[in-house]
Amino acid sequence: MFRRNELNKDFNHVIKLFYKERKKCIKIMEMITEASIEYVKKQVDCGIDCFQLFETYCGIIPEQLYTEFVLPYSRKILNAAMNKNCKTIFFPKNYNLGLKHLNKDICDIASVDWQIPIETARTLLNSDIGIQGNMDPRLFFSDKNEIEKYLMSLSEFGKKNTNWIFNLGHGFIPGIDVKNVNFVVDWIKNHN
């Protein structure tokens, strides 16, 4: 949102803004947050059951900087849904050890990517928060035996963690084998 059509996804210009022009950055964050809150309220008024906030580039910001200067704005957006009795899912991609900063006041469920083992994410998260994730979508390029081996390990995790939702650690990748997607969906349905 800071710079459209940016080909470089390390966002150095945004991080530089955080360090050099903190007041300007805070003003921009406040504007984005207020617009997002209005959007969330309208979504809830239109009947959504759950709101998910994606922080796809969370991991490019140092954890301390994200926790101190971005997470409070994410919390405000998520709280707008929570204040209207709407469940929330928060996906701070690649936040990893920062997951320890999440609590029930921020979200109902934390979605995690494949960069952190699901068991580690669970130990970092407050036990009141559900967890969603974290299959690496690139696994769809593998064969069914390899996929099933991974699903078996997740199944064991699911038996011990009833507040877990199976999901990818991020979206689908172009070119994946749809037969493998169907295999995963069927496997999850049959092993629930």
Which functions belong to the PLM regions below?
Residues 1-192:
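Active-site loop segments of alpha/beta catalytic cores
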